[in-house]
Amino acid sequence: PYPMSWEEQSILFAELPDHLRRMALYKVNSGSREQEVVKLRWDWEIPIPELNTSVFLIPADFGGRHESSGVKNGDERLVVLNNVAKSVIEGQRGLDPVWVFPYGQPDQNGKATPVHRMNDSAWKKARVRAAKKFQERFMRPAPAGFASIRVHDLKHTFGRRLRAAGVTEEDRKALLGHKNGSITSHYSAAELGKLIDEANRISATDS
């Protein structure tokens, strides 16, 4: 795993094509798995009017590309949105009635589809350019982990930033979707508000 620094993130994200940058920004601020991003659906969104926001609830039976790539441990997965993740979601509204990130090739009926994965040739090319930019800026080679940064490292980055910001292990587990038992859908608005506050703490930390 390679958690990125904020400087590395800004270098990498500047090299990503717009649709990938939106998904990556959402992923590094929500701790979602790759398939939970590319196949995110509007009908999974649940408004929380008391907090003037919404959350996403990934169904327990969501399998992603193949059965092992969706929700881990067979439970629903709650995704809370910090301010950055929320702004990404708001920017996607109205693009498509089904998919939050409708960036795949249109199907035979001309309807939007999701991409299969974020870790595609565009990601890999951006990674090469980012490593070169890193070397130009800091006059030393990019760390090996950054030069070969994987999409999954965005989730590790989120987890590391939560820890650096002093978020408790219990709340980190809830935010990363590691919590066992399908109690995630039974949070009160106050508990959700606390989780959102915790997720917002990462905006001012670096590690």
Predicted regions, residues:
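Catalytic-site neighborhood detector that most strongly recognizes the C-terminal catalytic loop/helix
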Residues: 62-65, 86, 107, 165, ...
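Conserved tyrosine-mediated DNA breakage-rejoining catalytic core shared by Y-recombinases
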Residues: 3-11, 30, 39-91
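Hydrophobic (often cysteine-bearing) scaffold residues that line and stabilize catalytic clefts
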Residues: 19-20, 81, 115, 119, ...
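Active-site/catalytic core of tyrosine-dependent DNA strand-transfer enzymes
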Residues: 7, 80-146
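Basic, Lys/Arg- and aromatic-enriched nucleic-acid-binding interface segment
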Residues: 1-40, 95, 155
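C-terminal catalytic core of tyrosine-transesterase DNA break-rejoin enzymes
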Residues: 22-25, 29-36, 153-179, 186
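Residue-level marker of regulatory loop/turn positions in helix-turn-helix DNA-binding domains and
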Residues: 1, 5, 15-17, 26, ...
